[in-house]
Amino acid sequence: MAPAKWLIASLAFASTGLAFTPEDFISAPRRGEAIPDPKGQFAVFPVSKYNFDTKDRPSGWNLLNLKTGDISVLTTDADVSEITWLGEGTNLLYVNGTDSVKGGVGIWISDAKNFGNAYKAGSIPGAFQGFKLAKSGDKINFVGYGQSTTKGDLYNEAAIEKPVSSARIYDSLFVRHWDAYVGTQFNAVFSGALTKNGNKYSFDGKLKNLVQPVKYAESPYPPFGGSGDYDLSPDGKTVAFMSKAPELPKANLTTSYIFTVPHDGSKVAEPINKRNGPRTPHGIEGASSSPVFSPDSKRIAYLQMATKNYESDRRVIHIAEVGSNKPAQRIASNWDRSPESIKWSSDGRTLYVTAEEHATGKLFTLPSDARDNHMPSAVKHDGSVSAFSFVGSSKSVLITGNSLWSNALYQIATPGRPNRKLFYANEHDPQLKGLGPNDIEPLWVDGARTKIHSWIVKPTGFDKNKVYPLAFLIHGGPQGSWGDNWSTRWNPRVWADQGYVVIAPNPTGSTGFGQKLTDDITNDWGGAPYKDLFKIWEHVRDNLKYVDTDNGIAAGASFGGFMINWIQGQELGRKFKALVSHDGTFVGSSKIGTDELFFIEHDFNGTFFEARQNYDRWDCSKPEYVAKWSTPQLVVHSDYDFRLSVAEGVGLFNVLQEKGVPSRLLNFPDESHCVTKPENSLVWHQQVLGWINKFSGINKSNPKAIKLSDCKVEVIDHEAGSYFDY
């Protein structure tokens, strides 16, 4: 399409301005999981909102009326870090981060109807979170987690004497994981009890470490483990937790077990699904997750993968009897989806599970005794499910969800019935005003081997008779997806409202479309996925007349960053006006510097020294590829990214500069694989969007679009003969 035609069309669109800006995106309220009270009348959830003027993020807790959808403020005390229902009417337990014990937290008891009238039940001498409660006689037993010292005590950073040397000494892996160097402390689940004295509960300060007696065990497992890694039985007597297999090398294998242990720690925890154990189905030795007790406390449901070094293998539901030596039962094992979380119905007959299907996080139900060929039934709801809880003892669940068009969707869902909307953020928050599902639609295109899904995200005020440049966004993983959910980092709506039509493809390797598509990227990073992307681009060029591919851009992070680097040296790289590579691999042999070796050893069919040819096969730095580089490229890489060393980004930038390709490096010394700090996020958006807008022509047609000059961070340029005028 001729640039002049696009320019006229864009000028017509430019008069609408920018509907959803990075400032709106970053400052919009962020709400967490809504958890209902035992009777299903109210739900409590956290909320925070970044303020660009004061440079802080005030936080608090709200109450959601489950009948009316009305929201009221429970507390604006930012020191309240956690709230959970006590299990008695509207009574609450909350954690206060300020305490008389330096570095510790306080446990407080209150009532949702009069939150200010609270009393302190006790102190915990260290950071502690993830409370789960269960009645046990006249006590309330609880579990939660914090960090443990090697002796098994709760770690308190404020009480630790600073060492005189900064040296670290390692005899095994991990050395560093995700964004931090591994130290001697580790996560552990602790148990305790609240004792009732008259009308009040008190805590005696005694905690039992349930994990430390198992040498080399850790739960929740970092970097993303949380309260979903453990559970407390409804009778309060037994605790289940997930840990990586203590006897196996954690950086090389994904194998993990579900352990059970008495709440009082009177016995050492034992695994119920140990590799090659009598209770473990034959051949099952992968990652375990999401242990949850049945209502009668007699069974545990959990998820487990089969393969021992593959983090994206298909999860299968298992059910084991507590205290029995019988083998665990596999439930609906032929279902070609990968469940992510489980809950039991109040009668124990039905399982509610979440799983991704066709780029949407859905809720499903199935009998707890379902046979292998049973296909779970989907429950109707909007958007994607991020969490859910039962409303009282009914079959209805309160869903906390989100979508591409709203960052918070609270709704009631009941199997066999339409969902009932309670609160949708895009209908209330001024920052999200105008966002909705009408600007988003799926696209299916014949790919390299099968039909491939993409999302089309259109700008606010979209007019099908006008033309918009293409923003081609490639997701990470590679075993991931662009789902119908809200991203707090790469948000397609922010890109679209600069004046683009966003195409967000789910090529080979993506999750939620059957395990085969996910598996097919193994040892084929630059093969089928690249062909899929090229075919999608061609389909958009030939069939979507409102998309200008001549002035399009492409961007990606993580695996998407690798793919951008790969595209730069391929034919598709010449189809774009600008590229953005965020934390992408560049040199094939550099992958050995990553943290989780099981990832590369699975995806490249062997170790770095035994299958070197596979690592070199998709090496973006090969001279024959670099010789083709010419498309302007922004490189983003941060210092705390230990998945992919910052040297990858610097090396990529070095070559771009020496090749004379218009390029810029954006580095954050205090960020990791993702840029999460609000002010850094704003700079990221100003640089990334400013970069693509400059080369796509948006800056010329729409004066309100972001420019590189909008960023107030000074550019470092020591080259007197700089060839490129920014």
Curated annotation (Swiss-Prot):
<feature type="glycosylation site" description="N-linked (GlcNAc...) asparagine">
    <location>
        <position position="96"/>
    </location>
</feature>
<dbReference type="InterPro" id="IPR011659">
    <property type="entry name" value="PD40"/>
</dbReference>
<dbReference type="Pfam" id="PF00326">
    <property type="entry name" value="Peptidase_S9"/>
</dbReference>
<keyword id="KW-0645">Protease</keyword>
<feature type="active site" description="Charge relay system">
    <location>
        <position position="673"/>
    </location>
</feature>
<protein>
    <recommendedName>
        <fullName>Dipeptidyl-peptidase 5</fullName>
        <ecNumber>3.4.14.-</ecNumber>
    </recommendedName>
</protein>
<comment type="function">
    <text>Extracellular dipeptidyl-peptidase which removes N-terminal dipeptides sequentially from polypeptides having unsubstituted N-termini. Contributes to pathogenicity.</text>
</comment>
<dbReference type="Pfam" id="PF07676">
    <property type="entry name" value="PD40"/>
</dbReference>
<feature type="active site" description="Charge relay system">
    <location>
        <position position="641"/>
    </location>
</feature>
<feature type="region of interest" description="Disordered">
    <location>
        <begin position="268"/>
        <end position="292"/>
    </location>
</feature>
<feature type="glycosylation site" description="N-linked (GlcNAc...) asparagine">
    <location>
        <position position="699"/>
    </location>
</feature>
<feature type="glycosylation site" description="N-linked (GlcNAc...) asparagine">
    <location>
        <position position="252"/>
    </location>
</feature>
<keyword id="KW-0843">Virulence</keyword>
<dbReference type="InterPro" id="IPR029058">
    <property type="entry name" value="AB_hydrolase_fold"/>
</dbReference>
<keyword id="KW-0031">Aminopeptidase</keyword>
<feature type="glycosylation site" description="N-linked (GlcNAc...) asparagine">
    <location>
        <position position="485"/>
    </location>
</feature>
<dbReference type="GO" id="GO:0005576">
    <property type="term" value="C:extracellular region"/>
</dbReference>
<comment type="similarity">
    <text>Belongs to the peptidase S9C family.</text>
</comment>
<keyword id="KW-0378">Hydrolase</keyword>
<dbReference type="GO" id="GO:0004252">
    <property type="term" value="F:serine-type endopeptidase activity"/>
</dbReference>
<feature type="glycosylation site" description="N-linked (GlcNAc...) asparagine">
    <location>
        <position position="605"/>
    </location>
</feature>
<dbReference type="InterPro" id="IPR001375">
    <property type="entry name" value="Peptidase_S9_cat"/>
</dbReference>
<keyword id="KW-0720">Serine protease</keyword>
<dbReference type="InterPro" id="IPR011042">
    <property type="entry name" value="6-blade_b-propeller_TolB-like"/>
</dbReference>
<keyword id="KW-0325">Glycoprotein</keyword>
<feature type="signal peptide">
    <location>
        <begin position="1"/>
        <end position="19"/>
    </location>
</feature>
<dbReference type="GO" id="GO:0006508">
    <property type="term" value="P:proteolysis"/>
</dbReference>
<dbReference type="GO" id="GO:0004177">
    <property type="term" value="F:aminopeptidase activity"/>
</dbReference>
<keyword id="KW-0732">Signal</keyword>
<keyword id="KW-0964">Secreted</keyword>
<feature type="active site" description="Charge relay system">
    <location>
        <position position="558"/>
    </location>
</feature>
